Amino acid sequence: MIFSAHRSIVVIVEGSLRSLALALVVAIALAGSAAAENGEFNRRATATAQILAGITPPAGDPALDRLVKLEAFAEHQKWMASHWGQARSRISAIESWRGQQVKISGANNKTLLYPFSGPDFLNAYAFFPDHPLYIFFSLERPGTLPDLESVTPAQFGKMLQDVRNAFRDIFERNYFITDYMSKQLTTPWIRGTVPVMATMMALMNLRIIRIEPIDLYPELTNSYEALEAKRPRRLMLGVRIDFSSANGGPLHQLYYFSVDAADKWLEFYPDFLDWVAQHRPASVLLKSASYLLHDSQFEKTRAMILSSADYVIQDDTGIPYRFLQQSPWRVRLYGRYHKPIKGLRYGYQADLESAYKAKSNLPELPFPFGYHWRGKRSGLLIANR
């Protein structure tokens, strides 16, 4: 993403409540796993996501059957088919490349950490489809799926237009633009990241088992909502989405949190980084992140990632190269290095540019990744230990 403001992370509970919170998360995961194994899924949520994706869901829900007969849906299907076709070819290239280049031991028992993610489920799932747990965090509110029960034809047409607006950049560029998202994800019909992530799940032929709000710090939330309380710039909001493949495969869980990850704002949620660190060793995805981890205001978040990760896929906007040059990290470079785009020149890394120049015949990157998405100008780095 391109950021105009600082990005984010998440939380849990204090002192003696920590173990209780962890037990609750484990219990929820076990319950969701049992539901997935029994072939259960939320038909309304899955069908709603399919409609937003331009996919006709199975008939049988009168509230939705009426909508897929409208001309607005036919137009939306045509647009999504065209634009998703382009994005799907990119995803296929990522999947093919991943099969050859990405080797993660024990992937089916690992967590993917995606800092500054926005609603970008597509890249997370394309690179790390075997991970059972995903932790996303960024500034955008989670929101909810739209309710299609009583939407009018006119409202439905506006909703689908909002979906197209929200997907335009990720389909074309393979990243979101923060300034645009502040408008795209706050319309009367598309609110927050949940509608976008759910739509992406439908496009990837996944089924939604449940979507539930999560508040890992209810006591803090209550105290910050009090009048005259000293509070963070943004209250942390969370959501958990359980999903599985269409054939009823293993359960996956996605935790998304909206919170500012700058050091001074994380002071309002002091245990969050410890909670994230409990998922070590984690895989990490960083892309189009406005070089936030180069900024001294994000030192705590950067330190947590470096101590918790054992496998990182990123572009040059992620962890500064100087940290990954050090033992015990091993680095592989792909594609090309280009200086940062206009407005982000402070992210230039002479050492990374030199590393690219020092290696001849670096493997090409067969898909766009990061801000240099036009042509074959993208670069990607894999670091593991």
Language model regions located:
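Composition-driven recognition of long, C-terminal low-complexity regions enriched in serine/threonine
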Residues: 1-6, 26-29, 169, 190-198, ...
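N-terminal secretory signal peptides that target proteins for export/translocation
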Residues: 1-17
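Bacterial N-terminal signal peptides
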Residues: 16-29
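Sec/Tat signal peptide C-region and signal peptidase I cleavage site
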Residues: 32-36
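Non-globular targeting/processing and membrane-anchoring segments
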Residues: 37-168, 251-385
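Short, thiol/selenol-centered motifs that function as redox-active sites or metal-ligating centers
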Residues: 117-128, 135-137, 173-198
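Thiol-based oxidoreductase modules, predominantly thioredoxin-like and allied folds used
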Residues: 134-185, 208-227
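Active-site/pore-lining binding-face segments in mid-to-C-terminal subdomains
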Residues: 202-273
